[in-house]
Swiss-Prot record:
One of its GO terms (molecular function) is structural constituent of cell wall. Residues 41-60 are annotated as: Disordered. Belongs to the SRP1/TIP1 family. The gene is CWP2. It holds the Pfam family PIR. Residues 1-20 form the signal peptide. It is a lipid-anchor; GPI-anchor. Extensively O-glycosylated. It is found in: Secreted, Cell wall; Membrane. This is Cell wall protein CWP2. It comes from Saccharomyces cerevisiae (strain ATCC 204508 / S288c).
């Protein structure tokens, strides 16, 4: 009974860690907005564009976009798992 408790707690901690590592990446703009990455696939359409005159606008923004590659979720999940294992070890 005690081994199964420790094994299940370890499995839950490992599952949380794997889920946190396999999450899709997002980026956060400096003003607090969060946007998804542009890895989504879209289907191509075969309709012709309407004929019109379009002026090219060059980007003149000096804003920088900082990307957050990881957060504390993985560390929290591992810490929670370690705490749960310590609590289970105390019950032995």
């Amino acid at each position: 009974m005690q081994f199964s408790t420790v094994a299940s707690v370890a499995f839950v901690a490992l599952a949380n860690f794997v889920a946190a590592e396999s999450a899709a990446a997002i980026s956060q703009i400096t003003d607090g907005q969060i946007q998804a990455t542009t890895t989504a696939t879209t289907e191509a359409t075969t309709t012709a564009a309407p004929s019109s005159t379009v002026e090219t606008v060059s980007p003149s923004s000096t804003e920088t976009i900082s990307q957050q590659t990881e957060n504390g979720a993985a560390k929290a999940a591992v810490g929670m798992g370690a705490g749960a294992l310590a609590a289970a070890a105390m019950l032995l």
